[in-house]
């Protein structure tokens, strides 16, 4: 019996503690490529009280405790074998205090969740923005004192922290700030008012001295104006002198420079400056003019500032160096080992040439190992620059990785021996720079020994309590008949950025992945599933029931792929894993039976083929020659026959000349979901041939899942292009509305509509506006969008037949989406997917809420008024 495991469960609950290998492999490293050991346990506490108990337990057992926020840094420091990982992402509550101009947040809150809510009231976090805000946690960002992109006027993260709640290694809870010892509930106003700046002790200490559980941070009003400038320069000296002048006159709010790496296409000049001006309207105009005068006086070349605007508002898409999102990282598998620190602005005149000389001198070795420069980016503060030196190499190449670490050491020695001071110290470069700090490093070690004598918190980070844990880069093993190998390269493209976890920019901490909300651990979300796939390819893990649970509990909603920074087709990775597991008999029982019924009966409901069109009154529509075919689908044909009937009546009203094939089989979506690719191919081929015989040129679909299978999956499975145009019925209706040939009757007074974007219609087919064109055409009705809409829409939980094996997941997801719909004040919830419709009607029976659930096409059929019949 594992007594530690039992004690951890007593503290956090059984659902928030794991020691399963498939889970543990997802918590061994951050965005860096160097794996550490495999932890023994992962815990997800929900409160400071639970953190205290966990820390005390680890201290008593002298068990290493590694802190896990969102793990989006490039610390490149792995955990110790058998350690406890403290995943703090469930502690994500926050409270805005606009009167006192602060926000109180728990450690796991995502920065952008706070900022998204603040913006609704005209406020923003005082800490400047940047790409990391989309996915980084409050506690982690403060612990590492992250240096954001806009530090010129606003400073670094720690400059805006008012107070902290910290759990020390012995379990003592410390509150810093002016209200630290106040028993009346007053908030902290000043950080160092009680004497020593205790908050500063933990800011930047990388979790080695205590666990940050809560933080109070400053906020500010959003400026009236945000303007942008983009200049390039031929000479390094001119660029640096321009920056010094901009800094001395405080003319730009933020200054960001590029001094190496790829340049935007079609841009003249060797060096780049991006300037952001944020201020009152009149002052912003003056500051912008001052920036222009300075840049021009140093021979700057004005460029289109749209690149700067995109850099600032959409930084993680790397617009600076691209014509479109993601192309900059498109050649990954690559890892970016960072060497970063502060240096005097004028020192760039020496440091940049020195870096270039080093690269030139070692170019042959760089080429041999496929290395290249990502960039020499500089975020300028008031009087210095924060230089990032990033190099890229093939992450899956063991020799390239070893050489990459040597380059990191060389560059660290080059910069820190003369110009650079530590900033954003992380474990990746700590071995090369911490000894250079001399007595400062000794003092940090003394503090560590005093506060954490058992060295339980993040041992090895910052070279405190031992060396960093760097595991070997495992070589990919030779696959033995794995379908997964066909998408193997995709698993190495994952940047581990964490964009697949939530849609924090919507506000509040809104979830993105229903299976992650259900499964609790990273192995249930995109980043973790990719880590699982990679472990299988590298021979660290084998397919088994535990892996199957984590892959087949996915609804294939596509949210992770849609929000992936790298635009990785994660669904294709999951699909190959499903095919591998189907071949090994690991398909879950319920889905397996669905696949059997589908293959035997031509539908997933085990109904007879002869009953497929019992609902169709006008049988003359069957098997007639026509250019348009209506593909009904299994769910409308057997389960939601009213939707099928309403659809054909609507087609008749619109004057569409269409046919329905009596030999229509299931589209094959259930078979694909079950990993039965070859059987799915049979169905796809049959349906194609059936409609070819009827002279079809266009297929109209009611079910978006069927349409997605034909449009997206069929070409890949059969290796041939789709011979017909595909169109959803909502697209057809929307076009008729826009043409003026039809109109919709008015709705009763007080009708408020909201709409759920089905995953297949939205993210898979990118049909977002057609349903909204229809909804906005109902006179007398008000349309209130749910906060998560279009590409951000939360799955109802019914996708890929998940309910058959994971009913709790479906119920959870459906209920969450239902509550979001209720929050809009709607009287009617509309959707365009019969599976979603069924799920919401089941939720309605449980809640007894008055919110109606209505199929949009059925509503259109009832309300449509045809003014002109066109030949369709």
Sequence positions of predicted segments:
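Cysteine-centered iron-sulfur cluster-binding motifs in ferredoxin-type domains/subunits
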Residues: 487-519, 523-526, 544, 548-568, ...
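C-terminal substrate-recognition/cap domain of FAD-linked oxidoreductases
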Residues: 231-232, 240-410, 414, 425-426
